[in-house]
């Protein structure tokens, strides 16, 4: 019998409520405000009242905090104009508070396939705003990302995950710039079989991402363990060096890779050996 609470099985709203101190949860632009995407109905897609994005203010260990959680169950957590604007604006407001001497801790729950195809360039523009806002606010407080599963984090939002000060992943998580189906479509099934689940998790799963240094904490699907990791990273403050500061090192490693050979877990581990 499992004696722990699953973080993966929580909705975005439940995740935000769980991470914030009890009784402090206050949602901004929630479902009753009906800030919905204006583009989906015309494409025969039923919109959601919060556009799949939960922004909640409260405290974590008594410190003012904002938790921004993507609902992976709505359109695969895809980022549209409204949902992207909600996240970007929340990050920008947190940065403004920090500059005013009122630091706000930032936690991102990332379950997303990337840009929402029905909104195309509007979603891409929103993701660019999110990247800029993360870079801004992380100068003052750590930005803590969580990729728990089962959607994973792909596309432009995987870059957002890489910009976070700290990243928490589970075994069920996946993290990659392109999703399995996209790679298979472009490179062929012999290069990347999207139906081969063990292979997919060996290449992009939370465990391998943690082992090669692209994530900072590898957790069980245990809500309390994840909450404790968030608390510890908040207390720790920003790292001395962000992953993005090491971009030249990563580029050199990738440029020296022989792309004529099929990559596997062993190759990835040797390529990104710490």
Language-model segments: residues:
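STAS-typified acidic loop motif
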Residues: 60-85
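Short Pro/Gly-enriched beta-strand edge/turn motifs at strand-loop
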Residues: 32-43
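N-terminal short beta-loop-beta anion/metal-coordinating cradle
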Residues: 44-62
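A glycine-rich phosphate/pyrophosphate-binding beta-strand-loop-alpha-helix module
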Residues: 97-121
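Amphipathic alpha-helical segments at domain termini/boundaries
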Residues: 1-28, 34, 184-274
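Glycine- and acidic-rich phosphate- and metal-coordinating loops
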Residues: 66-70, 104-113, 144-148
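Conserved catalytic cores of soluble enzyme domains
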Residues: 113-242
């Amino acid at each position: 019998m499992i004696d722990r609470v699953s973080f993966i099985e929580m909705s975005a709203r439940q995740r935000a409520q769980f991470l914030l101190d009890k009784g402090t949860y206050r949602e901004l632009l929630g479902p009753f405000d009906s800030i919905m995407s204006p583009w989906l109905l015309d494409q025969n897609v039923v919109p959601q009242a919060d556009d799949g994005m939960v922004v909640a203010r409260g405290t974590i260990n008594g410190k003012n905090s904002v938790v921004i959680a993507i609902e992976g169950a709505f359109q695969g957590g895809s980022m549209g104009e409204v949902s992207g604007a909600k996240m970007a604006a929340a990050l920008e407001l947190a940065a403004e508070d920090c500059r005013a001497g009122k630091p706000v801790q930032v936690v991102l729950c990332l379950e997303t396939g990337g840009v929402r195809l029905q909104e195309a360039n509007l979603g891409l523009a929103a993701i660019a705003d999110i990247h800029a806002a993360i870079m801004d606010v992380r100068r003052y407080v750590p930005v803590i990302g969580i990729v728990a599963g089962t959607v994973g984090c792909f596309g432009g939002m995987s870059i957002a995950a890489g910009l976070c000060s700290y990243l928490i992943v589970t075994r069920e998580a996946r993290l990659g710039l392109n999703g399995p189906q996209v790679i298979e479509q472009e490179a062929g099934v012999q290069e990347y079989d999207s139906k081969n689940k063990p292979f997919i998790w060996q290449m992009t799963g939370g465990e391998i991402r943690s082992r090669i240094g692209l994530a900072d904490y590898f957790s069980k699907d245990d809500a309390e363990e994840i909450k404790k990791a968030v608390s510890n990273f908040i207390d720790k403050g920003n790292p001395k060096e962000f992953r993005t500061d090491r971009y030249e090192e990563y580029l050199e490693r990738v440029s020296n890779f022989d792309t004529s050979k099929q990559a596997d877990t062993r190759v990835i581990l040797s390529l990104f050996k710490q």
